[in-house]
Amino acid sequence: MVVPSTAPASDDLFRRAQRVVPGGVNSPVRAFRAVGGTPRFMTSGSGPRLVDADGRTYVDLVCSWGPMILGHAHPDVVQAITAAAARGTSFGTPTPGEVELAELIVERVAPVEQVRLVNSGTEATMSAIRLARGFTGRPTIVKFAGCYHGHVDALLASAGSGVATLGLPDTPGVTGAATADTIVLPYNDLALVEATFAERGDTIAAVITESVAANMGVVPPLPGFNAGLRRLCDAHGALLVFDEVMTGFRVSRTGWWGLEGAVEGWAPDLFTFGKVMGGGLPAAAFGGRADVMARLAPAGPVYQAGTLSGNPLAVAAGLATLRACTDEVYATVDARAADVAGIVSTALNEQGVPHLLNSAGSLFSVFFTDATAVIDYAGAKRQASERYAAFFHSMLDAGVYLPPSAFEAWFVSAAHDDEAVERIAAAAPAAARAAAAVGAPVAVGGGAV
């Protein structure tokens, strides 16, 4: 089945949305600015599939940017949300469910001794860096170019995700004062981190890093990079903050730390989580060492709060999702991700399209580049984004929904069945031909359309 390029219902909805919503969307990457055309307005999802406002079905390789690891409308999650809603949607009080969810996170991720629930990954990272500053009494945060930690002002400098998609170096509204205590370094450059600590180590409160950089496309840490950050933080009395909003409970039951730090014998001081832990509803968390978390109000002086933190519906969805994420689920997701990545790479190879496929666990992305490696933001930006746009639209027309940006990770779910994979395989050759037909000027700075 080939999906026509036109989408009258989505066209109409987008026109209506642009009158009342800035840019017509509630998060920039959804607007298709990087690939052109009209964003598809989705009305329902089931398993690995989405249905748009025109009634057309797509195999989904976005999975709500990661949370839908079990697929859409998983019966256990739907039942949990329905039952929770019947009991009341919000109380503004502690609930038994939030204790259970916190206990489950602490049980799965050993270095997390205490955890605080919030509503979004942005809240989690914002709170984690405030806590790190409050605990150490130091002002400076080190982050890495291309890593995205939400839209908190102090961390939006040289960020990935939508900032990369739109080709923005920074954003108006973030003042110099807000980022004055933020140092941005190239990702995977441990020597430069070491030099920075040597010069300013007594001012650095924390280093925050995505466990795997996945908001400039997927760029795994080089061997020893994360462990090196741990060593340098220890040597200078700084905290290491691991942003596992994307990888947490997605690449394994214990997140990326379980695949790397747990094996190598080191751990961050603080973690941030989101996406999968909310089961598709707004939920996130930050947690870590008990002595650090003890500085949070009301136990300590570092203030953090939220009216809807620990919302009963989000907690119920998160509990149902995490409980359903068995070792078998992770094995299935890993296998399906490898299948899809292999199909796409084979199709591009057959058409002679230069590309690089990066992966970390079940996260992967395709860079349209002739480089032999992409290890940082500068390398991620040197790709032919016009080819990605052509590939994207051909797949979309064939009923496969990809991330509408070359700077985002691709996701599969445990619900991606043989039929879904076969549809991807059927669509990939034509998409590769479409990419091959496009010239390859290198896009530096996001390639916004």
Curated annotation (Swiss-Prot):
Subunit-level organization: Homodimer.
Pathway named in the protein's UniProt entry: Porphyrin-containing compound metabolism; protoporphyrin-IX biosynthesis; 5-aminolevulinate from L-glutamyl-tRNA(Glu): step 2/2
Protein source organism: Parafrankia sp. (strain EAN1pec)
Protein name per the record: Glutamate-1-semialdehyde 2,1-aminomutase
Keywords: Cytoplasm, Isomerase, Porphyrin biosynthesis, Pyridoxal phosphate
Signal peptide stretch: none
Main localization, broad class: cytoplasm
EC category name: isomerase
Coiled coil stretches, renumbered: none
Phylogenetic lineage: Bacteria, Bacillati, Actinomycetota, Actinomycetes, Frankiales
Residues found modified as N6-(pyridoxal phosphate)lysine: 275
Keyword Ribonucleoprotein: no
Reaction catalyzed: (S)-4-amino-5-oxopentanoate = 5-aminolevulinate
